[in-house]
A protein has these predicted regions:
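C-terminal beta-strand-rich structural cap/linker in extracellular carbohydrate-active enzymes
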Residues: 6, 228-259
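Solvent-exposed beta-hairpin/edge-strand motifs
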Residues: 209-225
Length: 259
């Protein structure tokens, strides 16, 4: 059996409690008739409608419109929105966009945080805690863009398991110059996604949701971090190293001893 994912439901307005009740009935009827093999994509960008605080039990949330044409796509803005919401909203429900960084470069001339200053892999990586959304036309992408396939294939291998954990923000708020990231918590294991933005230090200590004083084995799945075994400090602190600015690592971790 294959699950059907419906296109984005846009243009929706809920003007009254009666309308809200009727919409619930509609969604529930579709799920009942399809044996719950349908996922709705709900647009939360305008009007009075469902979003990350309501109706999110029915599928994914299309969170925001960002376009290089409008010069309102900055990778750290998108990452920051996901990071800030993830403490309160299931991150795995949020569709998070990455764009064609080769378009409209003239609109960002001289800007440190312009999309073209990041690798395409990094732009994709900023979306991993949510539902990655390639918010672009595939036409006229350069050949370089298609090397992303190896990274999307690597991601698919652990995406479901990572999304089945509780995803919370770690590190500092994304600012374009921070060490930041996410943690997916399961019982004695989970995942860490750590980003080094345009920060001068190649090594830092990141506060996590791990207990203090436990030994943690971290295996890199994506990005450019090295395998490590470390003991957590206060606030679950771990020392992380990444070789370059605007870089990242995805670790699968396991707690080896627990006090």
């Amino acid at each position: 059996v294959q699950t059907c994912v419906l296109p984005i439901l846009d243009g929706l307005t809920i003007p009254s409690k009666e309308a809200e009740t009727n919409l619930h009935r509609l969604f529930n009827k579709v799920l009942e008739e399809t044996d719950e093999e349908v996922i709705f994509n709900l647009d939360a960008t305008a009007s009075r409608r469902g979003g990350y605080h309501m109706f999110n039990e029915y599928g994914n949330i299309f969170l925001e419109n960002r376009y290089t044409d409008w010069q309102n796509y900055y990778p750290y803005w998108t990452l920051r929105n996901l990071w800030m919401l993830s403490k309160y909203v299931p991150a795995e429900k949020l569709q998070i966009e990455f764009l064609n960084k080769w378009r409209n470069t003239d609109k960002y001339k001289g800007e440190v945080f312009a999309p073209e200053n990041y690798s395409f892999e990094y732009l994709f990586a900023t979306t991993l805690a949510g539902q990655p959304l390639a918010w672009m036309e595939g036409t006229n992408l350069p050949e370089e863009a298609f090397t992303l396939r190896e990274h999307t294939e690597a991601y698919k291998k652990f995406q479901h398991d990572m999304h089945s954990g509780t995803i919370l923000p770690i590190g500092d708020e994304p600012s374009g110059r921070s060490w930041t990231g996410f943690q997916s918590l399961k019982k004695d294991r989970g995942y860490l996604i750590v980003y080094r933005e345009n920060h001068p230090e190649g090594t830092t200590e990141v506060d996590t949701w791990l207990p203090e004083g436990v030994t943690v084995r971290c295996i890199p799945l994506m990005g450019h971090g090295k395998a490590m075994t470390a003991v957590t400090g206060k606030k679950g602190r771990l020392e992380i190293s990444l070789p370059s600015i605007n870089d990242y690592v995805v670790y699968k971790y396991e707690i080896k001893n627990k006090r």
